[in-house]
Amino acid sequence: MNMEYTLSILKPDVIKRNIIGKVNTYIENSGLKIIAQKTLLLTKVQAENFYIIHKDRAYYQSLVQNMTSGPVVVQVLYGLNAVKKYREIIGATNPCDAKKGTIRGDIAKSIDENTVHGSDSLENADIEIKFFFALIEYAYL
């Protein structure tokens, strides 16, 4: 039984469409707990640094532009196998490929406005959470 933390980011399209609660319902219905949450407006430098691993990809500048186009909601999720579970409920990166019943399959508009970011590994979850949160903001026993 692996109790884990993972990072979730609700992207600007979620806030613009006023569907934060709808996305949170998917998270809560999966059994994951939202133990920390805050709304931020990322600067270009912050977005570039957060997504630095994608720097050489063709979509990098578009991703940075999207992530700085409005507020985001960053969350720390906690639960059994949280990284894997959240990746499953998110669905495929391209909403066209995402299964129904997943966040992206049900509510994402496009690959650019694909609703959420979720950590892809336990190691990246640790790095990504620390990018946005101090330990005191999310320590959960």
Swiss-Prot record:
Keywords: ATP-binding, Cytoplasm, Kinase, Magnesium, Metal-binding, Nucleotide metabolism, Nucleotide-binding, Phosphoprotein, Transferase. GO terms for molecular function: ATP binding; metal ion binding; nucleoside diphosphate kinase activity. This is Nucleoside diphosphate kinase. It catalyses: a 2'-deoxyribonucleoside 5'-diphosphate + ATP = a 2'-deoxyribonucleoside 5'-triphosphate + ADP; a ribonucleoside 5'-diphosphate + ATP = a ribonucleoside 5'-triphosphate + ADP. It comes from Orientia tsutsugamushi (strain Boryong). Its cofactor is Mg(2+). Its EC number is 2.7.4.6. ATP binds at K11, Y59, R87, T93, R104, N114. The keyword Phosphoprotein applies. One of its GO terms (biological process) is UTP biosynthetic process. Gene3D superfamilies: Nucleoside diphosphate kinase-like domain.
